[in-house]
Amino acid sequence: MSETVRVQLAPGWQPMTADDLPAGLLRGTQDTVRYIAAAVPQTRAYAPNLVVVRTPLGPDEDPGAVLVGSGRAIVDAIAGVRMIDECPAEHLREGGRLRSGIYILDETALTFMQLAWIQETLSEGACLWTATFTCATREFGAHFGHMYEMSQSLEVVA
């Protein structure tokens, strides 16, 4: 990993490592997950979280098509996801896309907000980056402002 993810975390949020997570949770994703943070819940509950993922593009892949198609990828990856919205996110990231959706996990309704963008470096070429914020749907209103502010501060430094 030749890049660093920087984000100004909201109060009560902290960076996480693979050691902080249940065993096997990141199985098969170790090469793509670049950053994880979560809010420390007051009680045993689903913790609001941020997961930043980097996916290298192949030399024949069209970055624009990959960026737009990445919205479909989250729908295909998580059973029952319903996309609510997807729109350009130029105000957050040049060429970026902002999307939101809902799904149910272990009887808990969850809402996600995802920022996706393409970033190119001389050493790595083009990569798709996604920063996905997720929390219990009933708490989304309370966390949205913090999630949006964190997405504004998010940067990847090579």
Model-based region annotation:
Residues V7, G101-Y103, F133:
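Preference for bulky hydrophobic residues occupying beta-strand positions
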Residues E3, A18-L128:
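Conserved polar/disulfide-associated segments of primarily extracytoplasmic proteins
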Residues M1-Q8:
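Short aromatic-glycine motifs in intrinsically disordered, low-complexity regions
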Residues P11-W13, W129-A158:
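Surface-exposed amphipathic alpha-helical segments
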